[in-house]
Amino acid sequence: MYLDLDVILAELKADDWLASDVDLDAIEEPKTSVATGIELQYVMEDEWDRDRVVRAHQEIASKNIELVPLTSDALDAAADLRAQYTALNVFDGVHLGSAAVLDEPIISTDTLFPEIPEVEHLDPRDLE
């Protein structure tokens, strides 16, 4: 299952609003794109110290979340989705495109994702 950034943040931030609702053990073969490591650095740059920010991808991997490569196929899928759904930002497109190419559902609380039928969406709060 492909994890969006909100699920990653729930695992890495003790005070995250979603932390008590995410159970990585309930997620089969969790994975995310290396782009999530970049997005995590961008989002946490003002909150974490620099040493932690620059190694954000290592924190993801330390949670036994597989970091999958960002491929040109995933970028093509992202481009197709962003062309069709103008509300998708760059990272939304990359995450959905990666999940689509991997043929994995995306685990996210993003309220836009259920409107994208090309990729199965699961809310982490609904997993047991």
Predicted regions and their residues:
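Short, well-structured N-terminal submotif of metal-dependent ribonuclease cores
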Residues: 1-32, 45-58
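Histidine- and aromatic-rich ligand-binding microenvironments
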Residues: 2-4, 32-34, 88-89, 110, ...
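Conserved glycosyltransferase catalytic-site signature
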Residues: 5, 72, 91-93
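A generic structural signal for short hydrophobic patches within well-formed alpha-helices
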Residues: 8-9, 37, 113-114
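Short loop->beta-strand "edge-of-pocket" segments that line small-molecule binding or catalytic clefts
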Residues: 29-31, 63-64, 105
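Acidic catalytic patch
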Residues: 64-84
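Acidic, PIN/NYN-like endoribonuclease modules and their adjacent C-terminal/linker elements
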Residues: 66-67, 96, 100-128
